[in-house]
A protein has these predicted regions:
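Transmembrane beta-strands of outer-membrane beta-barrel pores
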Residues: 14-18, 30, 44-50, 82-84, ...
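Short loop/turn motifs that connect adjacent beta-strands in outer-membrane beta-barrel proteins
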Residues: 1-6, 31-39, 70, 86-97, ...
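Residues that define the transmembrane beta-barrel architecture of outer-membrane proteins
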Residues: 6-8, 18-22, 36-38, 72-76, ...
Length: 165
């Protein structure tokens, strides 16, 4: 973690609502004192509803879709905070334990979820609507980029408190 005056790191994160890959992080830190650091970072996180389930198309195309899904939700989070080294590791042995606190703006990025739908033996790409679409006529999900031009931004605030091992 912190062996110099200034450091940066990036990575891929996993979270309980994010699927296989939850998101990504980029963080910069600068030393304030021996065990205390100022941090500035940005995270982009995929947020899935806990009840999302993938289904295979009843039409036999091998494509999957999520019944009931209206939007993809990503959270873009800016963070400014502090990190305190609680236990420092000895050279290449042991573990380091850090306490972290950060706060900053969040922007929820809502992107409409589109499906490929069979209507009158033709495939159509449409925004999912359970009052219009029937389960057995869904071919699968459309490209993620299908609704990108209809993105909606929802502002908010995020607070992060963590112990890092």
């Amino acid at each position: 973690y912190f062996d110099t005056e200034n450091e940066k790191y990036w990575g891929i994160s996993k979270n309980s609502w994010g699927g296989l890959i939850g998101g990504g992080v980029l963080k910069f830190s600068s030393k304030i004192s021996d065990n205390f650091y100022k941090t500035i970072g940005v995270e982009l996180v995929n947020i899935r509803h806990p009840n999302e389930n993938k289904y295979s198309s009843a039409l036999g195309f091998g494509r999957t879709f999520i019944w009931g899904k209206k939007n993809y939700l990503f959270s873009l989070r800016g963070q400014y905070g502090r990190e305190l080294i609680i236990i420092n590791k000895k050279e290449q042995e042991g573990i380091r334990i850090n306490a972290q606190f950060a706060i900053g703006p969040s922007f929820g990025l809502l992107i409409p979820y589109y499906i490929k739908y069979s209507r009158n033996n033709r495939m159509e790409i449409e925004n999912f609507d359970s009052s219009v679409h029937t389960f057995n006529n869904v071919i699968g999900s459309a490209s993620f980029l299908e609704g990108i031009n209809e993105i909606k931004i929802k502002p908010g605030v995020n607070i992060k408190a963590a112990l890092n091992f």
